């Protein structure tokens, strides 16, 4: 994707050639997705079905790539994760054992994966998601599709992504110092 869109407005040069997504990281690690069984409605008139959510997000990549690799890794995963560790991830990225509130107080920020780990059910993600890079609106963006048993699962996951349960750091809110939220803006939802 990067090679196809080199030079596109808002798509900076430092994106690694082998990066599957514009932000430079892999999305589909083993065990970081809900299973089909996890997202299937078990009973009732919609048994065997699921619910779907689709968002279109604009990405602010210029300022993202002004961050050091260390800072990008910290924001994607957790402040305690190093670039060397992140490069070796093939399975679900482990969330630090430290509680989210403690990380926020200690580092003044939390990581995207770390925040999402707080909403798992029996240790597994609640949504089955797909992220697809796009330039359809003239700049870098992302189509985000999720399947979940109930829209409540999407809402809980979205609240976790906003670190809704942690306000331990004065500079942490739903966007600032909160994973990758500062570099994404929802333009459409359905």
Task: Give short role names for the model-derived ranges.
Residues 1-190:
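Long, histidine/aromatic-enriched segments associated with O2/redox biology
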């Amino acid at each position: 994707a990067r090679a196809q869109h080199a030079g596109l407005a808002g798509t900076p040069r430092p994106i690694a050639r082998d990066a599957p997504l514009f932000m430079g990281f892999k999305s589909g690690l083993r065990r970081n997705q809900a299973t089909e069984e996890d997202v299937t409605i078990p009973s009732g008139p919609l048994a065997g079905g699921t619910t779907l959510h689709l968002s279109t997000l604009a990405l602010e990549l210029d300022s993202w790539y002004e961050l050091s690799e260390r800072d990008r890794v910290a924001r994607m995963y957790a402040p305690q994760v190093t670039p060397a560790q992140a490069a070796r991830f093939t399975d679900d990225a482990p969330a630090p054992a430290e509680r989210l509130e403690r990380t926020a107080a200690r580092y003044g920020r939390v990581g995207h994966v770390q925040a999402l780990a707080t909403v798992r059910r029996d240790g597994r993600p609640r949504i089955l998601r797909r992220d697809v890079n796009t330039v359809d609106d003239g700049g870098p963006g992302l189509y985000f599709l999720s399947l979940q048993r109930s829209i409540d699962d999407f809402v809980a996951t979205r609240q976790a992504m906003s670190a809704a349960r942690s306000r331990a750091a004065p500079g942490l809110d739903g966007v600032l110092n909160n994973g990758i939220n500062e570099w994404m803006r929802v333009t459409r939802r359905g």
